[in-house]
Amino acid sequence: MDRRSFLKTLGLGAASLVGPPACDSPERYLDSDIERLAEQKRREKEQSGKGPYGAQRYSGYRGLADLPYFELDANNDLRCIVEDLPPIIDFHAHLGMSFLFAPTIDWLARTERVQHFLDCDATNPGCEFDLDVYVNANFREDDLATLNWESVAQATWGSGAAATHTIPNLIREMDAMGIERAVLLPISLGLPFNDDSSALWSAAVEASGLGERLLPGATVHPRDPNALESLRAQVARGASALKLHPAVQRFYPDTPELEPIYAECGKIGLPVFFHGGRAGIEPEYTHRYTLIRHYEGAVAAHPEVRFVLGHAGARDVADAIPFAQKHRNVWVDIHGQGVSVLRELIDRVGAHRLLFGSDWPFYHLGASLAKVLIVTEGSPEVRSAILHGNAASLLAGEGL
């Protein structure tokens, strides 16, 4: 059996742990939804480089040093050289994950380099990296195969990439980019054992002594009968936000099962961070869960809850923009969107509703930062709001 066949077999086995969706209402996912995703990909590829910022293609993450905001240091690592940036808050980051049979990661270890899931600097020259498309459009077929391989490894023998997604490595990259704090968002997979990234990450952060800079979040699984009790325990540990991932956890955001969770978050002032929209590289059977219209019920029913829509709706950003315009209790994480779309988000949603996020360790922190610096050139107040002010207010329980 070759590597690709072996990977497919393992992937099917891993998928069986969570399973495809049960039958649900046909209107939950229509043929027109499938067609719109295909059209978005086609149109984005066609329009790349034709927006207000022209072509923005670079040779790997190190290639971002061609921009006036970065340089390569003595170790050939990317470093931000903008001197007047605010203390940046990354509202969308993670640590390495290991679950089921995989050995526990040493989150306090330091390695020579970080192996991002899109490892654009693994080769010299690096892979072509386009800042004017949704970020995962930069994944080539081999990159996706590697990502799938590492995803399976996180549940079995252990992921070599995930072993580099540690606290010292994250802090090193944060320091190089001028990022002061990062919100770490775990995901409960609903597995029978070895599935408590929230507690493990919190313990690692405490052991590192870096709790002022790294802010662990909470997570619950919608079908966990003890979800509310679990949430309260995580909040007692100091959780900064609740992460829910409809695609990975296979639920609709408007499911009645989550009503007590939303109500609790409103009561205690805890932001709810949703993965939002279809990224386009996840299993197709999960696409139905993340359509923007499925977030409407929860957001409308809980105006007291501060919701964050991750990835600005990903490839469904065209639906996410009017959704955010309609609901004043929705903030938008800008991670993943290209520079032309980021400009549109500022103009139509408003800079005061946008949050800087990196989705580290999928990508280098500089990938998201570069886009903000390009689009906010000459607009210091907009830059400060996106990189710091909005997140600081949200973490302080303000905004509504």
Residue spans for each PLM region:
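Histidine-centered divalent metal-coordination motifs
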Residues: H92-S98, H275, H311
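Twin-arginine (Tat) signal peptide motif
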Residues: M1-L7
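Alpha-helical scaffolding within the catalytic cores
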Residues: H165-L170, S198-A203, A227-L228, L291-Y295, ...
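Mid-to-C-terminal alpha-helical segments outside catalytic/metal-binding sites
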Residues: L7-L17, Y29-V82, P86, P103, ...
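Catalytic pocket-lining loop regions of alpha/beta-barrel enzymes
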Residues: A239-P246, R250-L355
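Conserved, mostly hydrophobic/aromatic
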Residues: H92, M174, C265, V332, ...
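Active-site gating/metal-coordination segments in enzymes
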Residues: A65, E180-F274, R278
